[in-house]
Amino acid sequence: KKITLLTALFGTFISASFAQNKFGYINSRELLEVMPEVKKADSSLQIYAKSFQDQLESMSKEYESKVKDFQANEKTMNEAVKEVKVKEVQQLQERMETLQQSAQEKTSKKREEMYKPILEKADKAIKDVAKENKYDYIFDASGGAILFAKDSDNVLSLVKTKLGIK
């Protein structure tokens, strides 16, 4: 009996404490999609990544040319020349692989650098909206953590207003 009574009292206490809290949610992906800073960052990142892509395409053409040249003239080459040509092709292939890996790492790092202030700005706006509107909790619906929420508690429009986005 004591356990049942304690469970009932505990359940009532939990229900009462949740009833006093104000919950809200936002889809952070949707917020980021409408922030002009994200569009600028994405555009800059595309240009940055394109410079690496152009280098890789140039190296790829050079690689194809060397392979075709080797295949066309292989029968007339002595062993020493063959070794040199094979080594050139292998070294070019290694440089291409290194450049591709480096490009991915540098682009990823650049993206993190460019997005950091944007994410901080969005986070600050969400926290400001939560405090100004007396929310106890704001959940991110883009993470799939909420299955149901009233539209009236979606704070996306308030955060967009806070950021000056229409």
Show the residue positions of the predicted features.
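Bacterial Sec-dependent N-terminal signal peptides
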Residues: 1-23
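Amphipathic, charged alpha-helical segments and their helix-to-coil junctions
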Residues: 20-166
